[in-house]
Amino acid sequence: MNLYVKSISKSIKGEKVLDDISYTFESGKIYGIYGKNGSGKTMLLRAIAGFINTDKGYIKYNHKALHKDMDVLPDLGAVIENISFWSMYSGFENLKMLSNIKGIVSDEEIYEIMIYFGLDPKSKKKVNKYSL
């Protein structure tokens, strides 16, 4: 299942923010988007996430068009620009709340991934006390 971005363009207040962008994102791969400040990175991600409509072009996932066959991409999780957690909760509590959105991640999986990244899932330390 690939994600196809085909010839999308977007203007805001007469200024072209996205200009004829096309790309195929292959399933199972990780991508990064980089560019200068104001180059349209966030706008592109917002378009892919279905948060905005584009002026031209289309976005398709699994041969279904965004905003035509579906409102948002299925199973999409996106944090665009500001990453934040609930500072008054522990790391495990934060991840547990996020996992409850779809209900597809078990407590055991949260424990395993926290241990993998060197975090103690049983710690009561609040995330605002974590070092970055």
For the regions a language model picked out, list residue spans one by one.
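Conserved ABC ATPase signature
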Residues: 125-132
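Conserved ABC ATPase "signature" region
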Residues: 107-123
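Pre-Walker A (P-loop) beta-loop-beta motif of ABC nucleotide-binding domains
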Residues: 21-32
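Helix-to-loop junction immediately C-terminal to a conserved catalytic motif
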Residues: 49
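Conserved ABC transporter NBD signature motif
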Residues: 57-72
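The feature captures the beta-strand-to-loop junction immediately N-terminal to the Walker
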Residues: 34-36
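Conserved structural motif at the start of ABC-family nucleotide-binding domains
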Residues: 3-5, 18-20
